[in-house]
Amino acid sequence: MDIEETIYKYALTNAIEHGNKCQVGSVIGMVMSKNPEMRKDPKTVSQLAGKLVAKVNNLTPEEQQKEVESLGGLEQHTKKEEKPKGLPELKNTEDKKVTLRFAPNPSGPLHIGHARAAILNKLYQEKYNGKLILRIEDTDPKRVEPDAYDAIPQDIKWLGIEPDEIYTQSDRLEIYYEYAQKAIEIGAAYMCKCDGGEFKKLKDNCQPCPCRSHTIEENMELWNNFENMEEGEAVLRIKTDINHKNPAIRDWVAMRIVNQEHPRLGNKYKIYPMMNFSVTVDDHLMGMTHVLRGKDHLANSEKQTYLYKHFGWDVPEFIHYGRLKMDDVELSTSKAREGIENKTYTGWDDPRLGTIRAIARRGIKKEVLYDLIEEIGTKQADATISWKKIYGLNRNIIEENTNRYFFIPNAVKVDVENLPSSKTNMTVERELHYNKPEKGFRNLTFNGSVYIPEDDYKHAQDKNIPLRLMDLINIKIEEDKVIYDSETLEDAQAQHARIIQWAPVETSISATVVMPDNTHVTGYIECDASNLEVDDMVQLERFGFARVDKINDNEITFYYTHN
């Protein structure tokens, strides 16, 4: 096999393994690593790789497959050794039912950051045959989005998570009141009426406020009168170490008054627990053995440990992981809501957002998130998820079973002139999936009038080179006329023609593809797409993968997934 044939085979291999598109750099790397003798002439290798990559990328998937088979099949090459999968072991799992919880605040639908917590808990539940609890933490009326009560269970269901038990904290206020009173009775908590600014000065100087020395009886009297006070007039504090090195840990607030109507409770209550109090009480009563949370909760874990010890309760194992970011995507719920309110975003499933429903609408599979989250694990180092990684994993999942169709973006209608009589009424049969003939075929009729992509039309016009309509004929553009040029693929390749998709004018269906930046690409799709159903995944040849979002009588709307 000569040098050109060798590089050609590697280019075909790279294309077939990566969505039918190869990259010059990848091909050169494969060639050099497997054929050390070629390192002596890198210039020639580089020039040939550039030419052959362009040739391969101009072939249809079927043509790539046929070409590589004619050369003896895919080139074998060394792949990077895969890292072993699996989460680290949890401590202290012996002789107990491992119990975990996913506890989101209902400030909006879930995003990828929430998915990390949900999936980690799910994976550990499965690993230890444990129990998983969903707990909606809605004890701050100012941070509750009513729609989230329905959205969170829906998002959890899409992730494939079925909690063993579900709780909503606003149903449990009387329980928190009971334990607040118990904390007072054992001397672990006190009612504080100090001005917030004054208390901070004392706290920062490791000095107790005057309220800390109240007797239990004095604290109970204030507690019993708490409901008659105004917001900010008093709080219930948990005693910690007033000399603690972190001022945030010192005598933290457990209960406060919130003068805001609660979406579920109305104005029935005005005394609400702070997160650290309600979470500790619930985690104990619900039998939590392990708590997985972000490292931004390190101080909260320490605060909660004081309350565990006050009550003589077992402290669960706390596992803290790093922050999760996503390239070019808004994960802040508050910023997303602001964008929705000012019409920057179309809703919680706007493709520019990192919400679960936005990702799902684009056709990203939940298995991708599981793979990513398991790989990142519980490391305390911050992690960034790239779209490139998501797309690669998703492509591996969907490619095998995704049918192919011709979509013509920004379509130009052309009438091919000078057709031989044998080409005036033809039917082209194409496989729905070139690797799975058992899936069947689609038929495209040709009578001279077709839609082709505007970009390809302009390219042929500017470069004065023909275009090949896939599996059909070659055409050329002379001024504003489209003329029959020749018939064979070899003729097209000899003239460096682009091989393009097309659709019959008479039978095509209007189609719109919503892109990741929320722009809309309009065009036409072949008539066999009328058999599609909502949520079907397709590969629009030479355009990308997409999910069927909506089907009307004469139009299909897709959401673009990736290339």
Curated annotation (Swiss-Prot):
Pfam families: tRNA-synt_1c, tRNA-synt_1c_C, tRNA-synt_1c_C2. One of its GO terms (cellular component) is protein-containing complex. A motif ('HIGH' region) lies at residues 104-114. The keyword Transport does not apply. Residues 76-94 have a biased composition (Basic and acidic residues). Transmembrane segments: none annotated. Its EC number is 6.1.1.17. Residues 61-94 are annotated as: Disordered. It is an enzyme of class 6 (ligase). Keywords: Aminoacyl-tRNA synthetase, ATP-binding, Cytoplasm, Ligase, Nucleotide-binding, Protein biosynthesis. It is found in: Cytoplasm. One of its GO terms (molecular function) is glutamate-tRNA ligase activity. InterPro entries: aa-tRNA-synth_I_CS, Gln/Glu-tRNA_Ligase, Glu-tRNA-synth_arc/euk, Glu/Gln-tRNA-synth, Glu/Gln-tRNA-synth_Ib_cat-dom, Glu/Gln-tRNA-synth_Ib_codon-bd, Rbsml_bL25/Gln-tRNA_synth_N, Ribosomal_bL25/Gln-tRNA_synth. It comes from the Archaea. Its main location: cytoplasm. The keyword Cytoplasm applies. It catalyses: tRNA(Glu) + L-glutamate + ATP = L-glutamyl-tRNA(Glu) + AMP + diphosphate. GO terms for biological process: amide biosynthetic process; glutamyl-tRNA aminoacylation. Catalyzes the attachment of glutamate to tRNA(Glu) in a two-step reaction: glutamate is first activated by ATP to form Glu-AMP and then transferred to the acceptor end of tRNA(Glu). PANTHER family: GLUTAMATE--TRNA LIGASE, GLUTAMINE-TRNA LIGASE. HAMAP family: Glu_tRNA_synth_type2 (MF_02076). Belongs to the class-I aminoacyl-tRNA synthetase family. Glutamate--tRNA ligase type 2 subfamily. This is Glutamate--tRNA ligase. It comes from Methanosphaera stadtmanae (strain ATCC 43021 / DSM 3091 / JCM 11832 / MCB-3).
